[in-house]
């Protein structure tokens, strides 16, 4: 009987050892996943136009009109794919599966990349409305519009395809016999900035709705003959759900990060146009407002205090910078429209 008791105690000790090892391993896994998630959630650093050209452009590419803009688009795409942790929006395993700040940041940057790719295909690479689309941009633009959350076939493979096509277009820009062009004209720039203006306006409204706003319906304002599909209410309260506040914040942060790089490149490519319209300072003001959105967030979480409350409201601060950039874009488009 004594031997049987010893045997049972030995078995229990063995089981306890295995349980302790399992619990310890799980705790170490969680700790490692948390630390890795924190590292992966750090936004990429800003880069200057010359640094981007040195990384992604051909030799002496800065001398060719269009290379700064195309190099920046390639840089944004490659950053999404090659930053620490890689592309996270379609991850199906921890720790990427548990993260949401960086995937929202990625989506904001991706939207700006898509808008620029569409502008390149639709306007910037074409001299007239009936001119032929560039073959490489025909591939790149839809490739960037592939579903960002798809795991199979992976979004990464489609975005790498877009990057390769953009690289081919960029090389051809410096080869006159290849027929690739980027036309730095005021009307082309105005068309692109119109898309930027609507994107920033939407982000500003979504950020401002973090505290809830009572808004009058101005959908048909200014046109007495205008109609819409369904009858809208005259006034409504718009408020971003509490669990989506940080999502909107980081989407705006990623969008602003990508856009400020694009506008720096546009300042280089469209320098003569901006000087002719006396609009360079206006563009610099937009860039400065966007740079302010990239300041370090010292709080461990995005706070949502009331407008004049005790606690900060990070969304309203971000909305302020985005709204000023939006207003400056509107002024810039007006300057470009002048003769």
Predicted regions and their residues:
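N-terminal Sec/ER secretory leader and immediately downstream segment
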Residues: 48-158
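Extended amphipathic alpha-helical interaction segments
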Residues: 159-287, 294
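Short, solvent-exposed secondary-structure capping/transition elements
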Residues: 119-133, 153, 175, 205, ...
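N-terminal positive-inside, membrane-proximal cytosolic segments immediately preceding the first
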Residues: 1-22
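Long, amphipathic, charge-rich alpha-helical segments that form helical bundles/coiled-coils
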Residues: 136-173, 282-307
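A cross-kingdom marker for long, charged
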Residues: 40-42, 47-56, 250, 256-339
């Amino acid at each position: 009987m004594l031997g049987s008791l010893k045997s049972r105690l030995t078995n229990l000790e063995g089981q306890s050892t295995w349980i302790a090892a399992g619990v310890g391993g799980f705790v170490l896994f969680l700790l490692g996943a948390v630390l890795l998630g924190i590292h992966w959630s750090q936004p990429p650093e800003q880069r200057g136009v010359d640094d981007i050209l040195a990384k992604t452009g051909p030799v002496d590419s800065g001398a060719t009109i269009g290379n700064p803009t195309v190099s920046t688009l390639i840089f944004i795409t490659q950053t999404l794919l090659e930053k620490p942790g890689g592309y996270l929006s379609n991850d199906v395993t921890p720790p990427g599966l548990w993260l949401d700040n960086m995937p929202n940041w990625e989506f904001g940057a991706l939207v700006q990349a898509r808008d620029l790719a569409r502008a390149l295909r639709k306007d910037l690479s074409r001299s007239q409305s009936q001119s032929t689309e560039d073959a490489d941009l025909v591939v790149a633009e839809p490739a960037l519009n592939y579903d960002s959350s798809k795991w199979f076939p992976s979004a990464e493979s489609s975005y790498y395809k877009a990057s390769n096509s953009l690289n081919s277009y960029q090389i051809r820009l410096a080869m006159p016999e290849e027929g690739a062009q980027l036309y730095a004209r005021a009307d082309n720039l105005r068309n692109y900035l119109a898309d930027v203006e609507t994107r920033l306006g939407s982000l500003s409204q979504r950020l401002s709705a973090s505290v809830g706003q009572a808004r009058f319906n101005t959908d048909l304002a200014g046109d007495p003959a205008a109609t819409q599909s369904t009858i809208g209410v005259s006034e409504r309260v718009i408020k971003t759900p509490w669990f989506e506040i940080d999502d909107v914040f980081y989407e705006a942060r990623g969008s602003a990060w990508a856009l400020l790089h694009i506008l720096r490149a546009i300042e280089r490519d469209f320098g003569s146009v901006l000087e002719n319209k006396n609009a360079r300072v206006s563009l610099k003001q937009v860039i400065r407002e966007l740079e302010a959105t990239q300041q370090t967030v010292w709080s461990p979480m995005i706070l949502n205090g009331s407008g004049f409350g005790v606690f900060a409201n990070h969304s309203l601060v971000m909305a302020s910078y985005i709204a000023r950039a939006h207003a400056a874009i509107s002024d810039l488009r007006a300057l470009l429209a002048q003769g």
